[in-house]
């Protein structure tokens, strides 16, 4: 059956209605009123993050230059010569029954073996840190993929690396939420929303605790040298704990590489975010007039520690940030200021009594 045609409808008004914008009347502000306004700042974080990501990728995956190949070839040739000379000395000592020389050769072999073993271990740990960057790239590709079959195996590998047991409630919820009809993007997204926040919450607690300790230490300590040593030790310890949470075992060189990348990231991004975050509270609440100089320095050191922890978290995390779940300095700012104010109030209360 065919439906009957609807009758024609005639409209009285024109199709295009001229919209005249309405402007408010002009207002003039004096100097006192102008001081209450702050200029609007454009959010340049995505551009900075993209530039920082490129710098980090270049540092994690350096190019194989000719000089680097020549140095590596020279070291390999020198190592082969040392091994050959050691074998020749050992054979001569055995033939001449020079037991003292034979013992020296055995001791040298043990020392060389220990050195080679430590170098191999450090190289493996540094390779593991570089692999984490490749895993983030793979996760980013899977989050834009409509294929099937790779997402589940990838997420199970991440859970195994992080030490998450199969009976963990978050992992069980993830298993219950996925099914065969979902593509890789949906599987990885579910893992990022159900399982990954468990590790992120632990890393946030570590950052909050280290930032609070740095803030209070600077606020109450009168010795600058002790403050510097304490902050350096706490920052290195924070990086180690965050790397351990995300399943990365840091060696000496990989720890230096990660610390270098974190400092490079902070220096490249600049202090604009730090100044903006601190100024939001200090300008609005006039805390600069109520807090001492040491307390202000403590808050600054705590925020720098928090920023370092956030960047270390970003480098060790196997998944890229999605849905604006990246922690910000504002998450730790109010907590640090509240702790400093509480500490100062506790210090004034006994003196008043």
Curated annotation (Swiss-Prot):
- Keywords for this entry? Cell inner membrane, Cell membrane, Membrane, Transmembrane, Transmembrane helix
- InterPro entries xref list: DUF697, UPF0283
Which cysteines are disulphide-bonded?
A: none
Taken from the UniProt entry, a GO cellular component term is:
plasma membrane
List all membrane-crossing ranges: 70-90, 100-120, 213-233
Q: Does the keyword Mitochondrion apply?
A: no
Keyword Metal-binding carried by entry? no
Report any Pfam family annotated for this entry. Answer: DUF697
The compartments listed are: Cell inner membrane
Main localization (coarse): membrane
- Topology of this chain in the membrane: Multi-pass membrane protein
Domain of life, per UniProt, equals Bacteria
Q: Which family does it belong to?
A: Belongs to the UPF0283 family.
The UniProt entry, under PANTHER family, shows: UPF0283 MEMBRANE PROTEIN YCJF (PTHR39342:SF1)
What is the protein name stated in its UniProt record? UPF0283 membrane protein YcjF
Name the species this protein comes from.
Escherichia coli O127:H6 (strain E2348/69 / EPEC)
């Amino acid at each position: 059956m065919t439906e009957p045609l609807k009758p024609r409808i005639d409209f009285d008004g024109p199709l295009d209605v001229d919209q005249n914008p309405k402007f408010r009347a002009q207002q003039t502000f004096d100097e006192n009123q102008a001081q209450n306004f702050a200029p609007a700042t454009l959010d340049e974080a995505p551009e900075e993050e993209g530039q920082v990501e490129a710098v980090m990728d270049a540092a994690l995956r350096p190019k194989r230059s000719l000089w680097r190949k020549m140095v590596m070839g020279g070291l390999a040739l020198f190592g082969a010569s040392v091994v050959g000379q050691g074998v020749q000395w050992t054979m001569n000592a055995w033939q001449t029954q020079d037991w003292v020389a034979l013992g020296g050769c055995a001791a040298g072999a043990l020392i060389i073996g220990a050195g080679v073993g430590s170098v191999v271990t450090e190289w493996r740990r540094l390779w593991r840190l570089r692999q984490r960057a490749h895993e983030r790239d793979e996760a980013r590709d899977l989050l834009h993929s409509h294929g099937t079959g790779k997402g589940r195996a990838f997420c199970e590998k991440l859970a195994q690396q992080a030490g998450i047991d199969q009976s963990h409630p978050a992992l069980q919820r993830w298993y219950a939420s996925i099914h065969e009809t979902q593509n890789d993007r949906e599987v990885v997204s579910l893992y990022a929303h159900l399982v990954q926040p468990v590790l992120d919450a632990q890393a946030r607690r570590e950052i909050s605790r280290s930032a609070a300790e740095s803030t209070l230490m600077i606020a109450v300590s009168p010795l600058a040298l002790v403050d510097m040593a304490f902050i350096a030790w706490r920052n290195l310890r924070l990086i180690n704990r965050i790397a351990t949470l995300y399943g990365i075992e840091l060696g000496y060189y990989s720890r230096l590489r990660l610390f270098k990348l974190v400092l490079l990231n902070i220096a490249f991004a600049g202090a604009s975010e730090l100044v903006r975050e601190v100024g939001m509270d200090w300008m609005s609440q006039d805390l600069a007039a109520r807090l001492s100089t040491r307390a202000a320095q403590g808050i600054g050191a705590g925020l720098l520690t928090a920023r370092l922890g956030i960047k270390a978290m970003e480098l060790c995390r196997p998944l890229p940030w999605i849905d604006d779940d990246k922690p910000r300095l504002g998450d730790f700012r109010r907590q640090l200021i509240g702790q400093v104010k509480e500490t100062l109030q506790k210090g004034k209360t006994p003196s008043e009594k």
